[in-house]
């Protein structure tokens, strides 16, 4: 129960992913699948290996909150040392084997040095890709199937739930790269001006309780493959316009999706992403999942009133990017998550009785569930971002972003400065804060501010 609720703060613990993962601007417009892959024939090019060592030290400050947060509280100190590796091997020209993995050694307050949580492993991807015909691919294994054109929220990214890798950055585009893949079988074909693909992800385990304390080398297939799911999509380019249509299939949660990207002039790119389907509201889904996994009592009622019946819900992200003289890029997006908490829901959440521990547990569980699903807890928000890859000097990169709730104006903000010491070394500092009144979405979090110092060594 406690671990499940602490997941609400996974999005508020800052640890920067590798700098090569943080450059998300190339996602607009999005490249076609495998379009960047060039079959190699020389023996020395059959193996591609990317390895880096990372040390990230985090300090955080907490505040008193109106709704009691069940223990354990978010940590104030953590040091994480990681070995991150991505290996691609082509035994023959038509076959590629891919392994993406991260091993962590964690030192953290209130955590015994040799406990089960000290050593962790995140198996992000492990799959084989076969090219039986030119530009036709069949992939099998654990694959990170990412979808969407927006940066702050991707309604068509249907395989994001339960994939969060511990201690990841707050940056949503980094989260989408640095996450667990799903075991699946995927086929896709590419042609000039478009592509088509279909995939099937089988149910391997029953749904499991949400965990914030990741143990040992658990691959966590129970969170990525807890339901039978399928996805079919087609992409096409018409002049400067890129579009994609998707059909997602899952029992009681099937959806259709569409996204489009188009440049406007020389420096602006506009994009929109939508998904819709019949589903329960976030509160009902969270309480139902807690009951199903045994985290909440079977007869636990929703802590605040909510619609129990399934209805058609829309998810939308619409916005654009503006690049100034190839030096600074600004992004502005509007997000609609129709199943999320409305202004009235947040008022009921913050006004709920505080003297009933079981009720407080359920209130925080709803937010922990939203974080685990990598979906907004609130119904409407704005996303703003600015990135300068060469700020003041060539080796300094600055970027920052904010999520602003349209229900109460509270804000989640992160600012990052990365300095490339050499081709092999990078140093970075990142700070994040939850800003708002004590009864607001962000201001109600116990963790008010956190910072991280990171040093990365590339091999």
Identify the function of each model-found stretch.
Residues 86-205, 236-237, 436:
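Outer membrane beta-barrel
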Residues 15-75, 84-86, 90:
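N-terminal periplasmic/intermembrane-space "pro-region" immediately following the signal or transit peptide
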Residues 382-386, 431, 445-459:
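Outer-membrane beta-barrel "beta-signal"
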Residues 49-53, 99, 140, 187, ...:
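Membrane-embedded beta-strand positions of outer-membrane beta-barrel proteins
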Residues 75-81, 119-124, 179-183, 190, ...:
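Residues that define the transmembrane beta-barrel architecture of outer-membrane proteins
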Residues 55-63, 91, 101-107, 142-146, ...:
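Transmembrane beta-strands of outer-membrane beta-barrel pores
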Residues 93-97, 135-138, 193-198, 205, ...:
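Repeated loop/turn-to-beta-strand initiation elements of outer-membrane beta-barrel proteins
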Residues 92-94, 240, 250, 261-403:
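Detector for outer-membrane/organellar transmembrane beta-barrel domains
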């Amino acid at each position: 129960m406690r671990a499940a609720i602490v997941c609400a703060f996974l999005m508020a613990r800052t640890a920067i992913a590798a700098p090569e993962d943080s450059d998300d601007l190339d996602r607009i417009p999005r490249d076609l699948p495998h379009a960047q892959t060039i079959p190699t024939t020389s023996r020395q090019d059959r193996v591609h290996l990317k390895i880096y060592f990372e040390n990230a030290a985090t300090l955080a400050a907490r505040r008193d909150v109106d709704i009691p947060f069940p223990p354990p509280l978010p940590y104030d100190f953590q040091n994480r040392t990681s070995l991150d590796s991505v290996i691609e091997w082509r035994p023959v020209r038509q076959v590629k084997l891919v392994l993406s993995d991260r091993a962590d050694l964690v030192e953290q307050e209130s955590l015994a040095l040799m406990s089960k949580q000290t050593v962790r492993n995140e198996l992000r991807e492990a799959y084989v890709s076969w090219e039986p015909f030119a530009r036709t691919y069949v992939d099998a294994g654990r694959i990170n199937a990412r979808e969407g054109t927006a940066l702050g929220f991707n309604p068509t990214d249907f395989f994001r739930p339960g994939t969060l890798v511990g201690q990841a950055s707050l940056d949503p585009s980094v989260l989408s790269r640095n996450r667990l893949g799903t075991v699946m079988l995927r086929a896709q074909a590419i042609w000039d001006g478009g592509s088509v693909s279909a995939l099937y992800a089988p149910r391997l385990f029953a749904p499991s309780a949400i965990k914030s304390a990741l143990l040992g080398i658990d691959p966590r297939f129970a969170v990525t493959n807890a339901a039978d799911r399928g996805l079919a999509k087609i992409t096409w380019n018409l002049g400067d316009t890129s579009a994609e249509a998707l059909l997602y299939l899952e029992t009681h949660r099937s959806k259709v999706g569409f996204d489009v990207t188009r440049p406007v002039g020389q420096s602006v790119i506009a994009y929109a992403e939508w998904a819709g389907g019949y589903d329960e509201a976030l509160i009902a889904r969270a309480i139902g999942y807690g009951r199903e996994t045994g985290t909440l009592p079977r007869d636990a009622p929703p802590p605040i009133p909510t619609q129990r019946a399934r209805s058609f819900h829309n998810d939308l992200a619409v916005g654009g990017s503006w690049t100034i003289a190839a030096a600074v890029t600004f992004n502005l997006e509007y997000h609609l998550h129709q199943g999320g908490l409305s202004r009235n829901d947040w008022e009921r959440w913050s006004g709920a009785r505080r003297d009933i521990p079981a009720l407080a547990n359920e209130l925080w569980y709803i937010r922990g569930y939203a974080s685990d699903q990598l979906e907004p807890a609130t119904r409407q928000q704005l996303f703003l971002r600015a990135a300068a890859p060469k700020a003041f000097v060539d080796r300094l990169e600055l970027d920052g972003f904010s999520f602003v709730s349209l229900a109460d104006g509270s804000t989640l903000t992160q600012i990052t400065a990365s300095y490339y010491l050499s081709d092999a070394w990078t140093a970075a500092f990142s700070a994040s804060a939850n800003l708002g009144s004590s009864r607001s979405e962000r201001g109600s979090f116990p963790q008010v501010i956190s910072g991280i110092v990171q040093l990365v060594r590339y091999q």
